[in-house]
UniProtKB/Swiss-Prot annotation:
Residue positions of the active site: C116
Alphabetically ordered keywords of this record: Ubl conjugation pathway
Function comment: E2-like enzyme which forms an intermediate with UFM1 via a thioester linkage.
Family annotation (Gene3D superfamilies): Ubiquitin Conjugating Enzyme (3.10.110.10)
Record PANTHER family: UBIQUITIN-FOLD MODIFIER-CONJUGATING ENZYME 1
CDD domains: UBCc_UFC1 (cd11686)
SUPFAM superfamilies xrefs: UBC-like
UniProt name for this protein: Ubiquitin-fold modifier-conjugating enzyme 1
InterPro entries: UBQ-conjugating_enzyme/RWD (IPR016135), Ufc1 (IPR014806)
Length: 166
């Protein structure tokens, strides 16, 4: 199910050890620290491989995340705001990543712009609890979703480049 490139990417993202969610007090703070270290490693690896495609930051508690993601299609950069909350049942439940400005533009999305990861990503996440974290959700969830959906939406004229649509 996972190709060689994806395996290589995954192998470079540190696995997490702390099994804690937002209501776990000190354990959550330890998990949040692990999440940040994993994300830093993933972003660093992406930059080294000329594959930089997102920025994320969180509130101080690490329960609300927001940032930007982008993809280049036909030599044009398409940039989107993204957001998600850490579910109470995290890490047993994967975060639901949302791109609000794309809400209603594709069938592979739920209300509020939450991207559909049910078929491919969620079973993989469930098999890897508590070792997968936010970096894994970006690498295995949002990244592939953007790579498939955005070029399709651009080709159909549903998503237009901001500079050329003015």
């Amino acid at each position: 199910m996972v190709d060689a490139h994806t395996r290589k990417t995954l192998a470079a993202i540190p696995l997490l050890r702390v099994n804690a969610g937002p209501r776990s007090g000190d354990l959550w703070r330890a998990r949040h620290k692990e999440e940040l270290m994993s994300l830093i490693t993933y972003v660093k690896n992406n930059k080294e491989n000329d594959n930089d495609w997102f920025r994320l930051e969180s509130n101080p508690e690490g329960t609300r995340w927001f940032g930007k993601c982008w993809i280049v299609v036909d030599m044009l950069k398409y940039e989107f705001d993204l957001e998600f909350d850490i579910p109470v049942a995290y890490p047993s439940t994967a975060p639901e990543i949302a791109i609000p400005e794309l809400d209603g533009k594709t069938a592979k999305m739920y209300r509020g712009g939450k991207i559909c990861l049910t078929d491919h990503f969620k079973p993989l996440w469930a098999r890897n609890v508590p070792h997968f974290g936010i970096a894994h959700a970006m690498a295995l969830g949002l990244g592939p979703w953007l790579a498939v959906e955005i070029p399709d939406l651009v080709s159909k004229g549903i998503v237009k480049h901001k500079e050329t649509s003015s």
